[in-house]
Every structure is written in C-alpha cells, then in structure tokens.
Amino acid sequence: MNQLTGQLVQYGRHRQRRSYARISEVLELPNLIEIQTSSYQWFLDEGLREMFQDISPIEDFTGNLSLEFIDYSLGDPKYPVEESKERDVTYSAPLRVKVRLINKETGEVKDQDVFMGDFPIMTDTGTFIINGAERVIVSQLVRSPSVYFSGKVDKNGKKGFTATVIPNRGAWLEYETDAKDVVYVRIDRTRKLPVTVLLRALGFGSDQEILDLIGENEYLRNTLDKDNTENSDKALLEIYERLRPGEPPTVENAKSLLDSRFFDPKRYDLANVGRYKINKKLHIKNRLFNQRLAETLVDPETGEILAEKGQILDRRTLDKVLPYLENGIGFRKLYPNGGVVEDEVMLQSIKIYAPTDAEGEQTINVIGNAYIEEAIKNITPADIISSISYFFNLLHGVGDTDDIDHLGNRRLRSVGELLQNQFRIGLSRMERVVRERMSIQDTNTITPQQLINIRPVIASIKEFFGSSQLSQFMDQTNPLAELTHKRRLSALGPGGLTRERAGMEVRDVHYSHYGRMCPIETPEGPNIGLINSLSSFAKVNRFGFIETPYRRVDPETGKVTPRIDYLTADEEDNYVVAQANAKLSDDGSFLDDSIVARFRGENTVVARNRVDYMDVSPKQVVSAATACIPFLENDDSNRALMGANMQRQAVPLMQPEAPIVGTGMEYVSGKDSGAAVICKHPGIVERVEAKNVWVRRYEEIDGQKVKGNLDKYSLLKFVRSNQGTCYNQRPIVSVGDEVVKGEILADGPSMELGELALGRNVMVGFMTWDGYNYEDAIIMSERLVKDDVYTSIHIEEYESEARDTKLGPEEITRDIPNVGEDALRNLDDRGIIRIGAEVNDGDLLVGKVTPKGVTELTAEERLLHAIFGEKAREVRDTSLRVPHGGGGIIHDVKVFNREDGDELPPGVNQLVRVYIVQKRKISEGDKMAGRHGNKGVISKILPEEDMPYLPDGTPIDIMLNPLGVPSRMNIGQVLELHMGMAARYLGIHIASPVFDGAREEDVWETLEEAGMSRDAKTVLYDGRTGEPFDNRVSVGIMYMIKLAHMVDDKLHARSTGPYSLVTQQPLGGKAQFGGQRFGEMEVWALEAYGAAYTLQEILTVKSDDVVGRVKTYEAIVKGDNVPEPGVPESFKVLIKELQSLGMDVKILSGDEEEIEMRDLEDEEDAKQADGLALSGDEAPEETASPDVERDAVTKE
C-alpha cells in the first residue's frame, strides 16, 4: 500500500473517512457557485458603469443639449429573500443614477438623481427571485468574436478555404475561394464580390497598388481578372448595389454606408475578447515560424542584421527576433486615397518564400495588423488587409486553419454579460426617446427627469428574467440538482445554436474540454452535448474563456513547483502536460524517466525534461455531480452519464444517510450548494433551537479573543421547493461549540452531518427470485417500507383567487350552494380549510362562489321577486378542491387581501394558498437507482420473512438482477458493494476519490481485514423454505437512491372528463385529466379479433359521439339498455373539411336515401316536439361552449 492510502481524513466537524487516495491534493476546490456570484458582482461593479459610459453623453441633433450619466448606486432591497418568495414579488433593489444635463448655449448645468427601476439582486446562493420563484441564469457557450479560417472541399474534390470575421455585434465579413481560384468576399451575408473590390473601396484603387500591397501571386491575378471595377469609385458603387439593392447608388452614400457598417464603434463591436483574439490570430510571428525568409531582417535602430535572407526561422531565431518585430521591423505606412479610409494605415509586412512552390523561388507577403491597442473595439482597415493577406498565405500553405469546436474559440457568457447585453438594449431604446424629447421640449425649463423614460430599460430586464431561454426555473429536487444547475453551460439560447442545426461535431467531446467541461455529465436526448457542466476546478477568465489549473514545472530544475497557473485551452496547446498520477519524489522531481503526458490532444510518452505542467488533481476532468460517483474509473461512460444525471433526481428522504462508500466530494457539494446554513463569522454557539441558531462572534484584538455581536441564523422548516420536494434544515452544532467561518451549522435536505446524502445504505444481493427482477426490476423487503427507510415528504401548493367578474365579484365563503355540512366540516368561518386537517381527493379546500349570468325568470320566480323584492342570488360553486392523487395533511394556509395592502395582480381581491403535505412510503412502481446508472423499477415488495437471509439470520433488503451488470459494464457497483460490506463490518466510512480510488487489491485487503472471504460471496438461505441456495451470492452494502419518478404521480384513471372543442374527443395526459388514446394500431388489434361491438363502442360513445355519450350516461344511471350509437363528431369535422374544399358531400344509406346529421339540440327539440319533454332533473345536456372545455357529464 502507498503511504497515503488508508489515512483517515476529516470532512467537516462530524465525519471521518478512510481515504484510498494515492495522490495528495495540492489545491482546494474553489467555491462551486463562484461562476454565478463573481460574474454578477462584476456586473454591479464594472458592467453597469461600462454601459453608462458607452451611452453618455447623449446629445440632441443640434449638439446643444448633452445628457451625461455620472454615477449610480443600488439601494436596499424592499423585502428580504424569504418574504419576497412568500409575497410573490421580485427580490430587487432600486437603481438610482446621477445624471447631468448641460445646456451648451447658456452654460447651465443641472444634476439630478434619477430612479431607473428596481434591479433584481442575486441571492447569496447564486439565484434570483423573480415574482416569488427562484430562477437561475445559465451561462451560455458561444463562438468567440474573432477571425476564423477553415478548409473546405468542393464537389469536384478541389481543396479551398473559407474565412469569417465574426464580431460581437455588427456585419460579418466572409472570404472564400471558388473552383477557378478566384478569391471572393461577402459583406454581411450578401452576394459575393471579388475580394479586390473591397480593397479598392478601402482606397487602394489601381491594380498595381493592390499587387504591391498583397504581393504578386496567381490567385490575386485571377481575382483581378474577374474584377471589372477599375477604381475606388466604381468599387464603392458595386458594393453599395449589393448591400442596398434597388436604391440609386452615389459614391458619398457608399462611403458613409461602409464606414458606418465597419468603422463606427456604435454599430460594430468586437468587445475586449474579439480584439484580443484578432490581434493574436493576425500576429505576424505565427506565420513566420519555420518559414524561409525572402528578405534580410535588420534592426531599424542599430542596423544590426537579425536574420539573413534565405534563413529558416526556427523557434530560437524567432524568439530572438520577436522583441524587434514588435518594435518596428517591416512596418509600412500606406496612404489610401479616394476610398472609405482617409487616414494612413500602419501595417507590418515581411516577405518569405512560399513553401508550396517547387523551385522555392516564389515570394509571398506576410502582413500583420501591427498590434492595434486593446481599446479599439471596432475593426480597422489594417485588420481587414491582414486578414485578406492571411487568406492568401493559406492558399500558399502558410498559416493554420481553426477548429471552431476548440474551447479556445468558444467562450462563456455568464450572468453578468447576459444582463449587460440586455441592459444595453434597454438603454439604447431609452437613448432614442431622450433624443426625441430634447428636440421637442423647451430647452430652458427641461430637467433630466423629464427627458429620461425608464420604461424600456425596465421592460428589457423584465423580459430577460421572465422569458429568456437562459433564465430557468431552478431545478431544486435536491441540493446537488441546485448546484449542477448553477454550473450548467448551454450552447442553446439567443445568439447560440439550435437543436436542429447542431451537428455531431459540436456535441462531441473535444480534447480541449479536459479540466474545463465535464465529458460525462450531459443530458440524454436531443440536447446531448449542447448542455454541459463546468468541471470541478475550472474558472472563467475576464474574456469568458474557461481556464483550468496546472502545477508549474520549473524548466531549469525539472521539479514540480507549488506555483499553480490557470491556463485557457489555446494556452495549453503550447505546453506538454503530465497526468496527476505521475510519480514524484519528496522534492517534486519526476521519478520515472519517461512520462505519460498530453500535447494538443495526443497522449504521448515524453522524456521528463520536456514536461511543462502537471495536472492538479485526478478529478479536475469531471464535474461536481460526476465526482460523487465512487469507482467511476470502473464504469462505462454511458452508464456514468446516467449515474451523474440520476443523482440530480434523488428525492430528499425523511431520514437521509451519507454513503458509507463516498468519494470525499459529498462534503464540498453539500456545503456549496446553498441548501445548508453556513457560518459567516467565527464565534461560539450560544443557543440552538429547531428554527434558529445563535452564534456569538469572536473578534481578534491584539491577540485577545473579544466577544462581539450575536448573529441569528434562521432555518427553513418544511418549505416547498420548486419541484414540490420538502426543504427542511436541522441544526448539527450544539451549545458551546466553537465554530469557524464557512462551517456548516445546519444540514439542508438530503444532507447528513454536513455531507450530501441522497439515499440510504442498504444490503443488496445480486440474485434472481422467481423472475421478479426480469428487465432490471428490483425486489425489495417490506422492512424498508415499515421502517420508513425510503419515505419522503412532498409538499404541493394550491391557490384560489377571488376576482372581479363582469357580473360582480367572486366571494370566498363557507356558504356554498348544494354542499352538505359534512363536506364543510374542516372549513373555518371564512370558508378556508384549517391547518392540520386530513383531506382526500375531491375535498373542499377553499369555498368560493361566482355570480351566474342573469337568466330569463320563470313565472314562479317573477312572483317571488314581486313579493320579496330581491331575486334569489344566482351563484355557481367554483371552490378549490383537492385534485386526484393530491390528498394529504394541510401544512399551511396563506391568505392575501387587497384591503390589507398586499400586492395582488390586477382584478384579484383575495388570494388563498393552501399547502398539502404528503408522506410517501416507497411502493411498487417507484423508480430507484444506484450511483452507477443501474436503475430499475420496484416490481415486488416481499414480506421480511420471505427475503433470503445471511447465515447469521439477517434478511437482505434488496435483490438486483445479476444480468444487469456484464452487458452494461458498470463494474463500479460490484466494487462498491464489496467495499461497503467490509466498511459496515469495520464500522468505518470510506472515501474513494474518482480516478484515484481503491484498486482491486485495496478492496481485497479491506475484505480480509473485515474477516470476509476474498470473493466476498456468501451462502444465502431461502426465506420461504429455509434451504440454502445452490450457489454462493454476492451480498453487500450499496447506496441506493429513490428518484423523483414516483408511481403516485403517474397513476391516472378517468371515467368522464373534459373533451376537446373541435373533435369532441377526450383530452390527453394526466394534467388535463385526459383519457387513454385508442390509436390506429389498437383498432387493428380489435379488428383482428373481430370484436365489432367493443370497437364500435370505443369509437363512438366512449369518444366523440356527443349525443350518444350523454344518452349512454343516462341509460347507465337509470339502469336501462344502452342505446344505439350515433355519428362521431370527428366524422362531421371531416365532412366540414371536405365542404370547405368546395365539395358537396351527402351521406347516403344502403338504399340510396340521404341520411340527415343531427346535433344534440336537434334531438332535444325533436323529443319535446314529440311530447317526450324531459323531467326537470334531467335538463338537456349543454355541449361544450366554444370558450371552455368542460366535462360533458358533470358540467364542470
């Protein structure tokens, strides 16, 4: 054994685990939700300021008035977080901006503080509360603005290239070659033009100027031959015709159009990242590397020769020349005339021999953009010329094409930037309004407040939080789901990809994902590979690129230093990186001579002196959820993906239990998820209650501990999460404990002693039992039901609102028509259910009546009206009732009244919210899973006495099918099973970190230590007969979780219910209380059996024969024979469809008589005409009125 394995490691205050790690951790895991919090913090500190600087000053059309934004401040939130949730409001703070209005004529300056709306504030846990619902803004992966070159092969097999200049916002520039070796340019996706047209338009009018600039070559000659414009003016007109077809072109218009398209910073923005990427790509050194010079390089200051003509620039020479390159070698000033560009253009150009030329005589120009400052955010003529030069260089074999799936070319837009973009849209709309108002209103009396209209700003922010694809309702099933959701990276969304267009390449795992994006955790289904998760150690840099930490190797000594560098994907491409498991001596030098390392996605073996960096940790590859799977290295990746995804669906149990076999990641995940209560300052616990913990702060003054303030931490008690699971916190510290900053004071849901605890440790045997675990089904002992091992608490929220209707206000009352006293027994005098009452399906929760329409009065009613003066108030019962499957215990009732000053939506006078809590024991049909993607449905719950038992008489808890293991190749579950059994006997907990956990030998040694046999199998006895089974069976402790797919939520039955308006067929789905569709294939089955009457009944009275279904219902109620079915409504719809196409459709009987179609009303009229009027209690059934889908039988 390695000296590290078998050490006890402390996780938090309460838990020790025996760790099987061989590699010591050199870097603490970062705060896992930092990606959210730091991005939002940047937005508040810098992002907003940038926006206000970009937009100010706003000047009117004459340039007389100017409005500047000077400073801004955020006030305090109106309500605290919990109260915002309760009141259904947004957790936000008022944004006030200091604005200055300057009148240049009079020199008058007015300063004013302007309120710019309430701005949503991020909570400490990285979420937003919007209208009372907790939401998360997911980070978006997009292509970075830059210039991209890529190869293409046309249909004749000829190789060519395409290039694209992609800005953050603005017009795209695309270059491409065709079959005849002509180079074309497209401006903003219009038709293509020869690239020389663009050069002429910039101000290089003659052929000779262009040849001098780019360098003589055959591709340029072909392009010039194709180009039929001779000078700048014609080129400008040509471009104008392409961009604005149909408008009369003039040279001046064309100049201003091109100028505004590309060189106006307001219209064209590369952002910081775009300028950085373009400077990097167009830097001349990348194209000079390993090329043969066609001119001598001389230091312009001293005249010293740096490199001879004909010399090859290898890495050494290039490193020597580099400082001089940036200092002015090859710099050229160009003076374009007659085109868009008025000023001189600075370029850097060096001649080299073309590597593709056989004789080696052809020279080509390599042009760089001469290091433009980062402050210039728009594209410059130098950028355009050097990108064209790069394109011609590529045709001669100089330069590299780009891989757009490389993470060096994809960046993250996190919360801050997404908000900033949205805010920019609002501000630019506001700017337009300000300009208009400046020109309309009187300049002397005007104030900043009158100019500024904050509506567009508020609207754009509201729209973003409310309806953007990236603003998502937080997945709050358990703390891990919360954590993962905040670390999610999506390639979808505005400005991103769409599911349909995304091909295989985008979705695939790329070598640059290493340590940045998890290769395992991604959804199954249409979004696979488009939604990813951030790796555990990854950070995001200021440009939005994902960085991962590496340990620096000192190039002089070859030792691994304690210094840690964060590298982006394209920086990493320049280095050789060793794996985290490379063997090191105590002083940090490599023990082996040859070392397995990575270089640009290739795994190679290199000499130890060639290593530049070393991985920080084996788990830096995977995400937080994947790092919670022990023995991950023994699982197939497809199953690991399911394991990582299913942990997020674990339902918090009543008595959670941390895994006996963990990975050591449980503590960090639990702490950072935001579900636990974290101590903010060091101190001593003074008082602990179920709902609150009080901590007395300690201040260090001159080395003495001095008592400070008393902090009160409130705990959540039985709160409904977004997904209807129960969020409940319990204190785990006791009075007198000294606590430090960052310590866990109270466990959240699915946590035990500060560790994530999604399920329970149960005794599992791999064996079949009378075929009940066919197809991954699970057989379970009744003990798990009886002892509430897998019992979870679910809270559902129901609301009823009393509105103003056209006929009068609705009223919440106990006085409901046609409801007996028995049904009202649990309602209080207001008509609202009492807390603690037990309710079943269909019980009243809130009594509510709605005024009915005024109907024509009968003679009797008119008489009563004449005598008593008041018509008996006509009301309908619209009470809130418990839906199917929603019964439980009333946990809480909240009442909001407009009179009491509560903010309610317009038209609502009173709102009642009722929370029903259910205790759900595990039952047949529930879905369960392990952590290795081994999922199944419970098929049978056996009495404890029938379960197989161990030699000491202990019955096992769960039986799994052994056939579920070999084909799925998730062997990790078997190792977990054995390790768990050994740990149970030894009374310890175990940490087996991913990719660095217990090996087979460790498992066997631990088994022997626990006194078990090496194969960990045992004799089992049949609980029914007491006979031993023929073979020994693998039995052990496995961590099993109960998933959110519970049979109680899926069970559904209907006899009558709502029908669709057009076809009159029952609706579908449990949510609509729909029926089971009897489709085309099912009809074939009945036809095959010749079950004619069953089939007729299904297609008519049980579906859309409107008349027939009412009559059938009546007949069943009265006990009569069921009448003949009529014509299905969908047949009538078909006839109408044909009639709408202009066909005259008649239905004829067998003897050519026309059959008349009759509606329900016609039937009733006919009956009444025949003197068969219905008695009062069987009034004619109303068909569904066009505005409401209703139950045709119970009329609800």
UniProtKB/Swiss-Prot annotation:
What are the start and end residues of every segment in region (Disordered)? 1152-1196
User: Which InterPro entries does the record match to this protein?
Assistant: DNA-dir_RNA_pol_bsu_ext_1_sf (IPR042107), DNA-dir_RNA_pol_bsu_external_1 (IPR019462), DNA-dir_RNA_pol_su2 (IPR015712), DNA-dir_RNAP_su2_dom (IPR007120), DNA-dir_RNAP_su2_hyb_sf (IPR037033), RNA_pol_bsu_bac (IPR010243), RNA_pol_bsu_CS (IPR007121), RNA_pol_bsu_protrusion (IPR007644)
Keyword annotations for this protein, in alphabetical order, are: DNA-directed RNA polymerase, Nucleotidyltransferase, Transcription, Transferase
Catalytic reaction list: RNA(n) + a ribonucleoside 5'-triphosphate = RNA(n+1) + diphosphate
Q: Where is the composition biased (Basic and acidic residues)?
A: 1187-1196
Pfam families found in the cross-reference section? RNA_pol_Rpb2_1 (PF04563), RNA_pol_Rpb2_2 (PF04561), RNA_pol_Rpb2_3 (PF04565), RNA_pol_Rpb2_45 (PF10385), RNA_pol_Rpb2_6 (PF00562), RNA_pol_Rpb2_7 (PF04560)
| A molecular-function term among this protein's GO annotations | DNA-directed RNA polymerase activity
Q: What does this protein do?
A: DNA-dependent RNA polymerase catalyzes the transcription of DNA into RNA using the four ribonucleoside triphosphates as substrates.
**NCBIfam families listed in its UniProt record:** PRK00405.1, rpoB
**Name of this chain's protein:** DNA-directed RNA polymerase subunit beta
Q: Which organism does this record belong to?
A: Bacillus velezensis (strain DSM 23117 / BGSC 10A6 / LMG 26770 / FZB42) (Bacillus amyloliquefaciens subsp. plantarum)
* Gene that specifies this protein: rpoB
